[in-house]
Amino acid sequence: MEEPKYTIDLRTNNGWWARLKSWFVGGRLVTPNQGSQTGPVSAHGYLGDSSINDERILQISTVWRCVSLISTLTACLPLDVFETDQNDNRKKVDLSNPLARLLRYSPNQYMTAQEFREAMTMQLCFYGNAYALVDRNSAGDVISLLPLQSANMDVKLVGKKVVYRYQRDSEYADFSQKEIFHLKGFGFTGLVGLSPIAFACKSAGVAVAMEDQQRDFFANGAKSPQILSTGEKVLTEQQRSQVEENFKEIAGGPVKKRLWILEAGFSTSAIGVTPQDAEMMASRKFQVSELARFFGVPPHLVGDVEKSTSWGSGIEQQNLGFLQYTLQPYISRWENSIQRWLIPSKDVGRLHAEHNLDGLLRGDSASRAAFMKAMGESGLRTINEMRRTDNMPPLPGGDVAMRQAQYVPITDLGTNKEPRNNGA
């Protein structure tokens, strides 16, 4: 049987030369013995007749919206590398830097930077961890990042070293910290993050069961289960089989008829509770808020607008609340993880990655105009800095900070002194 070929080279092909080489370059094969337990990674189980797994949970609209909202918005924010000199002056690193080019444009041969960050953040939202295989050049610079399946990774502490064991079909490979870029959610030990979807399994299972119940209800022609009463008449085995065959449609089969004629004292009655009795709509509405809480997403961003004003009266305030309470932890984890795993040790303290949040913080035109005016008049931003945020070309002389000439110290108020030349 031909051995499978993989697009992601983990340096663990089964050929003897690859096996021998892997001992010297890393990623060596290991035997699939018992690995460490780092808590639940994914969601699996049953609730009644409903099967619960990762794919089924992602089909819940609330979960899909929460995961896609966080991952897509985080990936849309510009992520650049900055350099800080000895005087604490910062400037953006140009694309001659391999890491800056990788984070801004192409982290690997088949993904854009946005697609890579989107996939990594999605796994971080879903599993609480995201992993990428790091490829470096001879100088130690990162030149490629390939995302890995979080559910296939086992992280354990061996002595004082962290070992990443990755499983691919029947293959196992061990990697060192230098070879893996690790995004972690919050967790007990700091070794790995906790999986939101694993801890939300019960709540998600209720949502799955309610969807399955409604699906079966409407597939049955919106008819509740029926019981057929024969009165005091006792049927033989043959008669019972015949009655079941004749009346299986009335018990919820796909055949729809306008009139049924019941003879010999037969009668039907519904059993179980109706969707109205079970308050299905109220229960499903509660599950929307319940699942949104696991991801920290405001309910109004997943379609529950009943209490949207609690997050602010305007779109700017709601965006600010979403940024502060939901996106900021993910943004900080990205920046800190890049600093920890991807910045060379010789550049720590000099280089750092940072997101540009201006696009997300934009409000309406009137609010933006007032903000820009205040920043310009106070000298906190130059004209070209403000034009750059709107993708407008620079103006000659627009790189000089300015402020109102009549501003004077409060100690000079009521005097005829000229405004002091403070260099503004």
UniProtKB/Swiss-Prot annotation:
Q: Which superkingdom heads the taxonomic lineage of this protein's source? A: Viruses
- What this protein is called in its record is Portal protein
Give the subcellular location: Virion
Q: Name one GO biological process term.
A: symbiont genome ejection through host cell envelope, long flexible tail mechanism
Q: What does this protein do?
A: Forms the portal vertex of the capsid. This portal plays critical roles in head assembly, genome packaging, neck/tail attachment, and genome ejection. The portal protein multimerizes as a single ring-shaped homododecamer arranged around a central channel. Binds to the terminase subunits to form the packaging machine.
**Mind listing the UniProt keywords for this protein, alphabetically?**
Capsid protein, Viral capsid assembly, Viral genome ejection through host cell envelope, Viral genome packaging, Viral long flexible tail ejection system, Viral penetration into host cytoplasm, Viral release from host cell, Virion, Virus entry into host cell
What GO cellular-component annotations does this UniProt entry give? viral capsid
Q: How does it assemble?
A: Homododecamer; forms a ring-like structure through which genomic DNA is translocated into the capsid. Asymmetry of the portal protein is induced upon binding of the large terminase and DNA. Interacts with the terminase large subunit; this interaction allows the packaging of viral DNA. Interacts with the capsid protein.
Matching Pfam families:
Phage_portal
The principal location of this protein is virion
Family under the similarity heading: Belongs to the phage portal family. HK97 subfamily.
